[in-house]
Amino acid sequence: MAAVPELTSEMMAYSSNNENDLFFEADGPGNDVKCCCQDLNHSSLVDEGIQLQVSHQLCNKSLRHFVSVIVALEKLKKPCPQVLQEDDLKSIFCYIFEEEPIICKTDADNFMSDAAMQSVDCKLQDISHKYLVLSNSYELRALHLNGENVNKQVVFHMSFVHGDESNNKIPVVLGIKQKNLYLSCVMKDGKPTLQLEKVDPKVYPKRKMEKRFVFNKIEIKNTVEFESSQYPNWYISTSQVEGMPVFLGNTRGGQDITDFTMEFSS
């Protein structure tokens, strides 16, 4: 290869007797050196009058990139005898840059939206006119009320959340107003079970609720059903018997009641 006429002072700064300094003058250590970029186009380097000699002691990707940059700069400084082709630029860039995949991670649970979360307050009655009442801290019961006792019925805070929405199913969560209690569905003794679960008011409700809290609201004429998203074909149900707990059932149109009327509350 033709020797580089003379290294500039900036380039000489890279030359030293330290074994970790890998650049030398053309007349420096000669017998033990070889080019770490053997896959470069040597003929093009000869044509351009560029000689690169590097120690074989260290040859890593960082050095390869550095050498490639110098080669590219030297080639670009000199007038090109022929028109620069696209492949020429491509070969230069291939030595300078390394393609790396960009992995975008999203966390659906932390998804936030600027839009206000939609919610409504409502009261529910089953089609036999039984009201839903909080009988103790963590249990709902269905019973008939009259007079002043009607005020004992619970008011639900129904929020619209993300879920598997379809034409006739709208994902919602049902919390008891002014209490940190939400209806949820869990497996107990091998059977899907409805329960009231206490939550952190600083966190709930949120747009991406855990699936156990989500119900698919299905409107049928003037009534609504609430199907568990966690357990499809299981519905919030009441018994024909007075005062029984509200439960999760898988019988529609039978002895158990799955149809409710909904009254919006201010």
From Swiss-Prot:
Location(s) in or outside the cell: Cytoplasm, Cytosol; Secreted; Lysosome; Secreted, Extracellular exosome
GO molecular function: cytokine activity; integrin binding; interleukin-1 receptor binding
Keyword Cytoplasm: yes
Secreted keyword on record: yes
Record-linked InterPro entries: IL-1_CS, IL-1_fam, IL-1_propep, IL1/FGF
Gene3D superfamilies: 2.80.10.50
GO biological process, any: positive regulation of immature T cell proliferation in thymus
Propiece residue ranges: 1-114
Disulphide bridges: none
Cellular component, GO, one term: lysosome
Family: Belongs to the IL-1 family.
Function: Potent pro-inflammatory cytokine. Initially discovered as the major endogenous pyrogen, induces prostaglandin synthesis, neutrophil influx and activation, T-cell activation and cytokine production, B-cell activation and antibody production, and fibroblast proliferation and collagen production. Promotes Th17 differentiation of T-cells. Synergizes with IL12/interleukin-12 to induce IFNG synthesis from T-helper 1 (Th1) cells. Plays a role in angiogenesis by inducing VEGF production synergistically with TNF and IL6.
Protein name (database record): Interleukin-1 beta
Organism listed in the record: Canis lupus familiaris
